[in-house]
Each structure stands twice: as structure tokens, then as C-alpha cells.
Amino acid sequence: MGNLRVSSMLLLSLMAAASANNFHQDVEITWGGGHARVLGRGNLLRLTMDKTAGGAGFKSNRDYLFGRFNMQMKLIAGNSAGTVTTFYLSSEGPSHDEIDLEFLGNKSGSPYTLHTNVFTRGQGGREEGFHLWFDPTKHFHTYSIVWNPKNIILVDSIPIRVFNNEESIGVPYPNNQRMKVYASLWDADDWATRGGRVKTDWSKAPFVAYYRNFVAKSDWEMQGLSARGKKLLSWVRKRCRIYYYCNDERHGRGSRHPPPPECKA
């Protein structure tokens, strides 16, 4: 895997750098009270979940129409079953747009699951799930959402998913609602780990996740993946993807739930 760990700058074809923001100035704690704490000089934020508060969350003060959004995250170590740690973009209202990165906790020794989804005008159903090929609890990793009129690219140091704009064949695409950056830690033991069969072990609380070096670059470029990036994306799909909505048996022949149009293309 050493030779696969190329930088997201290479994968995304020389995106320009932006200055890291300050959590004190640039985000608002939305829930959880003291369970969300900005530390140090403002570049580190800690979310804590225990039984007194089922987690915490924050959102950016600014909203954006397209851009690149980076967040370094260090996830809950040990037995994190039942927990969900998130980094995502969302607009407001019932017809909202949303681009999700959700990290589903695990029992010690099992891989974290990364759940992704794209909502357009309140409609989702475009999930892809992955088992991470690294331990996201030992070190900080930079997770990026690249959103432009052409495509959505989700990356760590390797591209994880691409969702292309295919409005020409009737696929809804989020391109006209401004979105804010959100992050949260919460208890979802009714579904998060093995479909809810593994519950949160509150004796392991508090559960703690860290965020740092939030960067939002509000201008956009018609970015795509390089040839190297496409090869790495193919590797992730073959080796790490555990769920793909187009392959869901609910969309099989004769189903009442036909596959989305991009699955037929």
C-alpha cells in the first residue's frame, strides 16, 4: 500500500492551496453543549459522546456553492460500536441537498465502515459503503469533499468515490443550493454496526473524535481524476467497497423499485 499513498493534490490535479480556518471564528456548535470543545489556538475541535449527551455537532458559519472542503479527523479508538462520526455538506429544508461521509463504529479489531450518500432535493438512496484499508484511529487523516458542477469526488489520500453530474439522462445533481459544512458524533446503535446487532457499550464511554485543520476553498475548478487517480479509484472499488446501490437486489428484474437511471447507463 505504500506506493498507493499519493497525495490528494496529485489525485485531484493540482488543486490550489487554501489557508486553514480557525474553529473559534468559523464554526458554530449546533448541539451537545460542552461535549463540543474547541482546543488550543482554534485549529482542533473535540466531540465527545456519553450517556448524558448522545453526542455533539457543529457547522460552518459560511455556506458555499461548490468548492473543496478538507477536514483532518481522528476517529474513536477501541470499541466504537454503535457510534457514527460524520463530515458532510448540507443545505436546509425538506428539499435539501447533502453529500455525506459517515464513519460507522466497530468492535475492537474490526475495520471501520465508511458510508457515503448523495441527496438531491431531499432524495437520497445513492449509498456506497467501504471498509477502510487503514486504521483511522491511530493518526489524523485528511478527508476531502470536492464538489463542482461536473462531479463530486470523495477522498482520503486515495479517491474513494466519484458521483458524476448526469442530469442529461435524468439523474438529479446538487448544483443550485448553497450548503454548509457539518460534523457530528452521535449514537446510532439501532443501525450503525452490523445493522444494529452490535450495540453501544456505554462502559467504554466517553467516546471521543477529533477534528483539525478545517479548510474550505470556495472557488471551484472543473476538476476530474487523473489517470493515476482513476486507477486508484478502481482499486478501492474492487478491494474495499462493500455496498453499491446500483447492485442492490431491491432493483432486480421485476422489482417495484427500479434502479436509478445512472445504474442503467
Where in this protein do the model-derived segments appear?
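GH16 jelly-roll
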Residues: 2-265
